[in-house]
Amino acid sequence: MGAEPTAEREYVAEPDVGRLFSLDSLVRLSDALPSSYWRLDGVARALQDAATEDWEDCGIVTDALWLARRTSFRRVGPWPVIYDRLRLTTFCAGVGAAWAERRTNIYVGDQLVIEAASLWVPVDPRGFPVRIPATFHEIFGEAMKGRRVSGRVPVTLPPDGAARRPWPLRRADLDVIGHVNNAAVWQAVAEVFDAPVESVDVIHHGPVEEGHEVELVTSGDTMWLVVDGEVRVTASIVGDVVHDARR
């Protein structure tokens, strides 16, 4: 039997058994700030690419898609800058009834610089949740080592007096089921928070879809995407990095 589900963010170590998948990448011009630092939405896009490549490579045949429910990452080394060559190593770190946690480590050379943990939910082509197939456990189960994770996510509401402005959606933001893509949501995060940061946590409480009139709400170290008064996305950071050995 696995451990009881955990609700807190935890960055478990890379397993010594089971499936690990690695992908090489680069901090490209399109993902770098004027300061040369890797933008937050660029990090999120790389994490999504690694997850997609791993899923396509694993051999499971299904029409299910995976949607991000929560993505967190923290800085553990110098923040990457433009043209840094990256290696992303990813693995499944635990499951629940209808969700799974993916851990990804990002390296520059041999140095671990960012640790990430993402909660993903499988859905059918219409966007409805489905259960994780048995073949998933056959391929990814050994690396999980019986760990169970909770699907619950915390909810915070904007305070009175928080700054508000429209956040127009573009057709380029939409994915194949009509939701605003995870990486596109992170563009709103990057609009509010510059990299580098010590850590960041983004939670999807509900979909943002074509036709929605979205408000971008900010207060201190937290931002929200709000539709018709309902929080759909929450993002929070822990402190800007003031001193970095690379700069």
Give the residues covered by each predicted segment.
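Acidic/His-leaning functional-site neighborhoods
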Residues: 161, 165-241
